[in-house]
C-alpha cells in the first residue's frame, strides 16, 4: 500500500494489471471499475500490463514488447479526462490485433488518434457487432496461449451481453474492456457462429404458432431467397404437365437420372418437401431443415429459378444504330421525294410525272397494306417472333399466318379489280371521258393526286403571258392577263397544305422510329412503305401548292419544311419507345395509320382518276399494287434468313 501511495494515482491500468496478473475470478470487476471511474494506476502495474500484452501476441519480426513502454501508455491521456478509459481499452485492443502496426503508430505519435478512430468505427448498434467480430478475428490470429481448463471460448454475443449487464449496452468502451479481461485470463475466442445459429435464425423468420415451418412459410422464405417456382394448389396439381416451362420432380429412385438434368429445374416449396418425404401437415422441423437446406443452396447456386437473361435479338440494333439507320432512312425518303419534285418543274415531263405518280399510288397502297397486315400485325400480336429459341419457333404459327393474311389482301385486290373493270368496261358520262378527276370538295391528298397531266405544270409568270394555271377551274378570272388579288381561302391554302403535310410526316416519322426500335428488318419494311406513299404524297402536295399559285421556289421551300417534321417524329419515337410493350402499342398505331392512308386516301385517288389512256393507267396501278405486296410478302417470309 505504501508503494501505491508513493506513485502517481492512475485509475484503470493498475486494476487492469492486477486483473491480468492475479487472474481474478470475476472478469466483470474491471468493467465495473471502468464504468465507475474508480481505481489507481502506477508504473509497476503498467509494467505488468506491458508484459502480459507482450506475452499474448506474436510478432514475426521479433519481440513485440520492445516498442511499447510505460510512457507510451501514460501518453494516451490523464485518467480524469473524459473517454480516457475507453481510449486505453481501444489502444490495447489495437496492439493485440496488430502489434507491428501499433508499434509504427507509437513511433509516429498517432496511437491515441488510432484508438479514437477505432471507437468511432464501433459506435452504434449496427456497427459494433460486425466490427467486434472482425477485431476478434485479428486478435485471434495474433495471440498465443491456450485457454484455461474447462473454460469455454468467448464469442462477440457474450462480450456484448456482459457489457450490457454492466449497464453500458452498445458502448464500445465497456465492450473492449470486457475483451481485455478475457485476454488477460487467457480465454480463447470463437469468432464465427455455431451451426445451430443458422437454424435458429431461419426459424425466427416464421411467425406461426407452431415450432415448425409450414408450407406457406417455406414458400415465402424461398421467395425471399429468390428460389422456387410457383406452388400449385391441390386442385390444379394434376394439370402440372400442361404448364409451360414447368417441370415436376421425379422420385429420387428414378432410374438413369442424371444430375445434369436437374441443374435447370426450378422447384417449388411443395416440390422440395416431396423430395425429402416431408409431410405438408407436419411442416419442416429443425431437424428436417438441415436436410432440405442443400436443396435451397442448389437452387440458388444453379440459378434455376432466376429470371432467364433476355438475350439480345439477333436483329436488334444498338441505340446509336437506331438513330443512324432511322435518320438515313428518313433522309433518303425526303431526298427521293424532293428529287421527284423536279419532274413537276419540267413542262416536258408533265405526262411522265403523271404516270410516275399513278404508279407510286399503286405501290403505296400495296406497301402500306402489305406492311400493316403481313409484317406489323403478326409482330404486334406476337405471332411472328425473331431470335427466339427453337422450341418457341416450333410452337409459332410460321408461314401459315402470313398466307392467311395474303388471302385477306387478295380479297381486297379482287374487289379493286371488280370496281376498276366495271369502271373501264361500262359506259361513262361524256364529262368523265375528258380526262378530268371526279368531283370533290375541299383540299385533300386525293385531290392533289388526281390532277391531270395538263395540270402538273407550274403557272406562267405574268411576263410570260397568260396561260391556264392550276386554279383555272375554280377561278376563271385568273385567265385574264391582268393579275388579280387572290381570295383569302386561296392565300391560306398553301399553309393549310403545309400544316397537314407536316403532321402527316410527323406520324410517318413516329412509325419509322418505332419500327427501327424493334429491329432493322421491321425498320426496312416500314421505311419502304413510307417511301412508297410519301413520294406520291409529296408530288401531289407540291402540285397543289403550284395549283394555289405559288412560285416553284417557295413551294419547294414549304415542301421541305413539312418534310423536316418526319425527323422530329423519328427522334421522339426512338427516345420514348424503349420497352417491348410500348413498342407493340406504337406499332399498332402505325398499323391504323397505314391502313387509313392506304384505304381512305390512296385507294380512292386510284379509283377516281381519269386519263385518256385508261388501260395504261390500269396496268400501272396493278404493277404498283402487286409489286408492293410482293416485296412485303418476300420480306415477311424470308426476313429471318437475311443478315445485316
Swiss-Prot record:
Q: Which organism is it from?
A: Pteropus alecto (Black flying fox)
Q: Where is this motif: Essential for SLC39A4 endocytosis?
A: 449-451
| Subunit structure as annotated in this protein's UniProt entry | Homodimer.
UniProt keyword annotation of Cell membrane present: yes
Q: What does this protein do?
A: Selective transporter that mediates the uptake of Zn(2+). Plays an essential role for dietary zinc uptake from small intestine. The Zn(2+) uniporter activity is regulated by zinc availability. Also exhibits polyspecific binding and transport of Cu(2+), Cd(2+) and possibly Ni(2+) but at higher concentrations.
Which residues does the annotation list for site: Essential role in Zn(2+) sensing? 508
Which stretches are tagged as biased composition: Polar residues? 247-259
Pfam families assigned to the protein according to its UniProt record, in alphabetical order: EF-hand_Zip (PF21116), Zip (PF02535), ZIP4_domain (PF18292)
> What topology does the record note for this protein and the membrane?
Multi-pass membrane protein
Leader peptide range in chain numbering = 1-27
Protein name (Swiss-Prot/TrEMBL)? Zinc transporter ZIP4
Q: Where is the composition biased (Basic and acidic residues)?
A: 233-244, 456-467
Q: Where are the transmembrane segments?
A: 324-344, 356-376, 405-425, 496-515, 524-550, 556-576, 584-604, 615-635
Extracellular-facing ranges? 28-323, 377-404, 516-523, 577-583, 636-644
